[in-house]
From Swiss-Prot:
Belongs to the universal ribosomal protein uL23 family. Gene3D superfamilies: 3.30.70.330. The keyword Lyase does not apply. This is Large ribosomal subunit protein uL23cz/uL23cy.
């Protein structure tokens, strides 16, 4: 699981769990197919859609820092990630 940094727990991500969508911060150099295969292999689920966006970097004296992007992963109906649901509840 080199590419996935951690699961995101925000108000929006909590609302998306009811729609069977989970939010993760991932390495910016990882591809969509790598992230999809890691999620399917590690959690044992089927991914049907993935949306991603880069978060704005923080301003520093010597430039920007941006080391990750956010992925919203939609699972097939009937699948869920129980470890994240237990974390949220």
């Amino acid at each position: 699981m080199d590419g996935i940094k951690y699961a995101v727990v925000t108000d929006k991500s909590l609302r998306l769990v009811s729609k069977n969508q989970y939010t993760f911060n991932v390495e910016s150099g990882s591809t969509r197919t790598e992230i999809k295969s890691w999620v399917e292999l590690f959690f044992g689920v089927k991914v049907i859609a993935m949306n991603s966006h880069r978060l704005p970097g923080k301003r520093r004296r010597m430039g920007h820092t941006m080391h990750y992007r956010r992925m919203i992963i939609t699972l097939q109906p009937g699948y869920s990630i129980p470890s994240l649901i237990n974390l949220i509840i």
